């Protein structure tokens, strides 16, 4: 995967999202949604705080805040730049492992092969308070708009 141009900075907000490869469905049944949410908890706990999320049949949106590492004696002497780089790598690696894990589970469950998502997950920094509020409202509005179709699954 190509290197991410924008690093993840502790205490900053980001919009993570991706969609199915060729816009295919990535959540085929209710259990897939549950498995995805459990994966977020398993892989991203301690690295990001999920502020809002929306899982749709063909894609997902996550509004997250990168968690600042607690200062310990081991890392106290490191510069803030080193800590930023470490947080950025940890978040990227955790998301990568999480999405690979989810893809493998779906491929096994539905006897399929290949990529499930359209490339690397997208991550946009949330640079203003206004954008944070707008994004949060957008994510929740998308969920309400698609809730009837999710209940049918």
Model-derived segments and spans:
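Short catalytic/metal-binding and nucleic-acid-binding patches
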Residues: 1-153
């Amino acid at each position: 995967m190509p290197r991410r141009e924008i690093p993840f900075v502790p205490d900053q907000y980001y919009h993570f999202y991706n969609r199915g490869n060729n816009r295919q469905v990535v959540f085929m049944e209710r259990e897939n949604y549950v498995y995805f949410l459990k994966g977020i908890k398993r892989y991203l706990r301690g690295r990001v705080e999920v502020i809002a999320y929306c899982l749709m049949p063909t894609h997902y949106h996550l509004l997250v805040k990168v968690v600042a590492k607690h200062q310990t004696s081991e890392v106290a002497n490191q510069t803030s730049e080193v800590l930023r780089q470490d947080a950025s790598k940890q978040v990227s690696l955790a998301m990568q492992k999480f999405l690979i894990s989810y893809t493998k589970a779906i491929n096994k469950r539905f006897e399929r092969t290949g990529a499930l998502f359209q490339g690397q997950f997208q991550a946009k920094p949330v640079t203003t308070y206004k954008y944070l509020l707008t994004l949060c409202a957008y994510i929740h509005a998308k969920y309400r708009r698609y809730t009837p179709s999710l209940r049918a699954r």
